[in-house]
Swiss-Prot record:
Full protein name: ATP synthase F(1) complex catalytic subunit beta, mitochondrial
Phosphoserine: modified positions: 415, 433, 529
Subcellular location: Mitochondrion inner membrane
Enzyme Commission identifier(s): 7.1.2.2
Organism of derivation: Rattus norvegicus
Physiological role: Catalytic subunit beta, of the soluble F(1) head domain within the mitochondrial ATP synthase complex (F(1)F(0) ATP synthase or complex V) that produces ATP from ADP and phosphate inorganique in the presence of a proton gradient across the membrane which is generated by electron transport complexes of the respiratory chain. With the non-catalytic subunit alpha (ATP5F1A), forms the catalytic core in the F(1) domain. Catalytic subunit beta, of the mitochondrial membrane ATP synthase complex (F(1)F(0) ATP synthase or Complex V) that produces ATP from ADP in the presence of a proton gradient across the membrane which is generated by electron transport complexes of the respiratory chain. ATP synthase complex consist of a soluble F(1) head domain - the catalytic core - and a membrane F(1) domain - the membrane proton channel. These two domains are linked by a central stalk rotating inside the F(1) region and a stationary peripheral stalk.
Cited InterPro entries: AAA+_ATPase, ATP-synt_VA_C, ATP_synth_F1_bsu, ATPase_a/bsu_AS, ATPase_alpha/beta_chains, ATPase_F1/V1/A1_a/bsu_N, ATPase_F1/V1/A1_a/bsu_N_sf, ATPase_F1/V1/A1_a/bsu_nucl-bd
Keyword Ribonucleoprotein in annotation: no
Binding site for Mg(2+) 2: 238
């Protein structure tokens, strides 16, 4: 009888190892990836350390099984806690494993942060004694690192003495700031119609080729100039080519400076070809870099995550490898917890703020898919880039009617800003509803009032365009950063009819309204001569 029980237990354990028996993982459900270890607290320890690698622990184990990105390690003594980083010994390249489950019999199940090719059973593994720690501080600006903090830009080591664990708790309630404040971006259409809240989360929706990258670079540039703030770009499941292009475009536009220490952005990449463990953690690495600037330097940091869907997708792959029972549409059962644990760390404290702009891929354009639906619950604003607007040559191609913001409230932005924004949206909506009539009957059949609406709407549409500083090399137009007061004043005067006499092309690709007036005078001179 005992031998039968032993065989059943053995079969169950081996089935769990192969991922065949998801029920075998259930007793360890409370030990999964979603909780931070006891030693990790928002009051981070940024103490100087002498070497790039975190201080090693003493426990040594050996690999007993390798199933793709999942590696089981047995320790004779000193079992490492959940989320600890382990390092495989005797390899040329550094391979870090993160503890995900305790299986019993002194064995831990880990997720590899890099490829497991060449691993063999019996190989030695050392416990680092802490979660994955990465370099933080001003030295990370202008550099590209991977999920475990190694530089991947071929420019030597990141010379910082400060390291931080990628797992941390969200700031406590007493540390949070309750003030609602606009983060002025200097981009007219964003500041007027869908303003970003300091410490808020913005969803950036846009297909290929509508200007997502240029908008991201302009935001990085403007935040550095207007607020003196830094930015962090986390490429989660990105195409390597796109990440490479972005890096070189940033060098060309001056956002990254290779000659001196004036770079404004740190880059963290976990590309599409990386194992799921790396893609599931790289967003946390980027967030940790941003948290240092917020908590230690009191900065207003901009954190870009491209693409937040890949974070969820990687979590789903990891979950399946760990043998958990899948939830709706095959996603991990801890989807909401994984997302919430990360998103709650993106917030405003009394020291500074992290404002996050997250590119969101919507699978099969289905907004009810659990991955985007879970993300929407955390968003404060949405910026929708429209191909139809890009085709008109209006950049940034932000859709003024589809983009929304939670802080578009007269109690937060003020009644003047609110009234002007709603007035602009109303006139654009009226123009949209008149377009069918214009297409069939022509402009001549409209009433005088409707003709005026169309004329003003077309001027507003063009005035929502703006030359970007990072795109000067392509457009030949000098970039403009427009203060919020100037933006409100300009649109207010167009709505009031103060510029009904100016031609609509005068409003295209200008900064404040005074430039439109000057451009109209210049056009009149050219036509007069």
């Amino acid at each position: 009888m005992l031998s039968l029980v032993g065989r059943v237990a053995s079969a169950s354990a081996s089935g769990a190892l192969r991922g065949l028996n998801p029920l075998a993982a259930l007793p360890q459900a409370h030990l999964l990836l979603r909780t931070a270890p006891a030693g990790v607290h928002p009051a981070r320890d940024y103490a100087a350390q002498s070497s790039a690698a975190p201080k090693a622990g003493t426990a040594t184990g050996q690999i007993v099984a390798v199933i793709g990105a999942v590696v089981d390690v047995q320790f004779d003594e000193g079992l490492p806690p959940i989320l600890n980083a382990l390092e495989v010994q005797g390899r040329e390249s550094r391979l870090v494993l993160e503890v995900a489950q305790h299986l019993g019999e002194s064995t831990v199940r880990t997720i590899a942060m890099d490829g497991t090719e060449g691993l063999v059973r019996g190989q030695k593994v050392l416990d680092s004694g802490a979660p994955i720690k990465i370099p933080v501080g001003p030295e990370t600006l202008g550099r590209i690192m991977n999920v475990i903090g190694e530089p991947i830009d071929e420019r030597g080591p990141i010379k910082t003495k400060q390291f931080a664990p990628i797992h941390a708790e969200a700031p406590e309630f007493i540390e949070m700031s309750v003030e609602q404040e606009i983060l002025v971006t200097g981009i007219k259409v964003v500041d007027l119609l869908a303003p970003y809240a300091k410490g808020g989360k913005i969803g950036l929706f846009g297909g290929a080729g509508v200007g997502k990258t240029v908008l991201i670079m302009e935001l990085i540039n403007n935040v550095a100039k207007a607020h003196g703030g830094y930015s962090v770009f986390a490429g989660v499941g990105e195409r390597t080519r796109e990440g490479n292009d972005l890096y070189h475009e940033m060098i060309e536009s001056g956002v990254i400076n290779l000659k001196d220490a004036t770079s404004k952005v740190a880059l963290v990449y976990g590309q599409m070809n990386e194992p799921p463990g790396a893609r599931a953690r790289v967003a946390l690495t980027g967030l940790t870099v941003a948290e240092y600037f917020r908590d230690q330097e009191g900065q207003d940091v901009l954190l870009f995550i491209d693409n937040i869907f890949r974070f969820t997708q990687a979590g789903s792959e990891v979950s399946a490898l760990l043998g958990r029972i899948p939830s709706a549409v095959g996603y991990q059962p801890t989807l909401a917890t994984d997302m919430g644990t990360m998103q709650e760390r993106i917030t405003t404290t009394k020291k500074g703020s992290i404002t996050s702009v997250q590119a969101i891929y919507v699978p099969a354009d289905d907004l009810t898919d659990p991955a985007p639906a879970t993300t929407f619950a955390h968003l404060d604003a949405t910026t929708v880039l429209s191909r139809a607007i890009a085709e008109l040559g209006i950049y940034p191609a932000v859709d003024p009617l589809d983009s929304t913001s939670r802080i578009m409230d007269p109690n937060i932005v003020g009644s003047e800003h609110y009234d002007v924004a709603r007035g602009v949206q109303k006139i654009l909506q009226d123009y949209k509803s008149l377009q069918d009539i214009i297409a069939i009957l022509g402009m001549d059949e409209l009433s005088e009032e409707d003709k005026l609406t169309v004329s003003r709407a077309r001027k507003i549409q063009r005035f929502l365009s703006q030359p970007f500083q990072v795109a000067e090399v392509f457009t030949g137009h000098m970039g403009k950063l427009v203060p919020l007061k100037e933006t409100i004043k300009g649109f207010q005067q167009i709505l009031a009819g103060d510029y009904d006499h100016l031609p609509e092309q005068a409003f295209y690709m200008v900064g404040p309204i005074e430039e439109a007036v000057a451009k109209a005078d210049k056009l009149a001179e050219e036509h007069g001569s």
